[in-house]
Amino acid sequence: MVQGSPFVVVANRLPVDEVTDDTPSSRTSGGRRWRPSPGGLVTALHPVLAEHKGTWIGWSGTPGPAPDPFEVDGIKLVPMSLSEDEVERYYEGQSNATIWPLYHDNVEPPIFRRRWRDTYREVNRRYAAAAAKVAAPGATVWVQDYQLQLVPAMLREQRPDLLIGFFLHIPFPPIELFMQLPQRAEVLRGLLGADLVGFQQRLGAQNFLRLSKHLLGTPYSGSTLEYEGRKVKAEAFPISIDFAEMQRLADNPLVRERAKQIRAELGDPKTVILGVDRLDYTKGIEHRLKAFRELLADGKLSVPESVMVQVATPSRERVEHYQALRVKVEREVGRINGDFGKVGVPAVHYLHQSYSRSELAALYCAADVMMVTPLRDGMNLVAKEYVAARAENGGALVLSEFAGAAGELRQAFLCNPHDLDGVKDALMRAVTVDEGEARRRMSIMQRHLRKHDVAAWASEFLDSLAEIGGTEKNRL
């Protein structure tokens, strides 16, 4: 087992995916091949982990016994085992059928099961034990997201010497919603085991502070509360993307050529409207489809001049809510294409599959309008990726007010996804915006994201955590 790491990341998943082919970029361990996962979190933390001989603890993604610890690109990886039952109860159940919908404003009713809670607790205990075992004395441990909310307190009980941070990537709900959680006090105490609890938005931090006072009587002042003789800070750290990497990808001649090819395959329409989402009920896919259908029915948009491309990446396919959502979305797509499509020219090109980073960049480059209309979202990095990919090409972003990104991307065409007329109005303003105005808006958003990228996010969080620990950042 890995020992003595000064910096430990604890997340549901490892930052690698197992591969079955001979991918050149993959690494071999114990007869199994791995490649780094795409994603901003991995990109942001890789330099810190590599520099400080850090360790990442997480599940490999495959049920069954865990592989032995191994190393990829200078980062020590400690795989966690999850049985089929644990995947069903801890991950698909408590994490994604209970906590996920509850934290997203009950967009779908959460399901409460005692056996799910018990398994969630046991899995969190194993993650905490693994972190306690590998962390060096006085190490910094950064716990990630809603699947592991009990870990900070469990870890502090075993290793009070550690500096513990926690970051929640999804929204944190108001008191009246959180109080529905049968495990509410246990989850709150779990989070209070951290020295710093980070949220995507200031409202999430405020909800957390108010909840702590309401449920546990914990006094707070500003962003700091006192709990069991310790000070715990709750602050907002809006996550971002690797802006430079997405811009480089979008500037690649092969990606540019692919973008032209995509437009040609779509019939060279005047306006390409794009949606890229996990197939999730929080993303508002149905709402944007209905808005598009009504604009076609009103005659404000027409096929083939305007077409929509909706990428709906498969997600949590064994969870009942997600199965039902797929049926609804595909029924709506069929209705639109039946009513407004033409021979060889569907109104909506619906793609229920995953895409590579380069193909997504090509889609961003090909799209005149990007629609990001979640009913509730912690941040939404797709909106930021679209902005980064546009370079000097203008384009327009239609963005839900309920995405965390709306707090930063104020030059987007903001809308309330529950207000269908408002969504239609925002889409039409985006479609008809003057080219110069589109470039101006996009330029302002790009300047912001260039400065506030994912590396800045990680640095800001770790700086704040180190300050709480009474040390400089080089504590790591």
Predicted regions and their residues:
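Catalytic cores of carbohydrate-active enzymes across secretory and cytosolic contexts
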Residues: 1-476
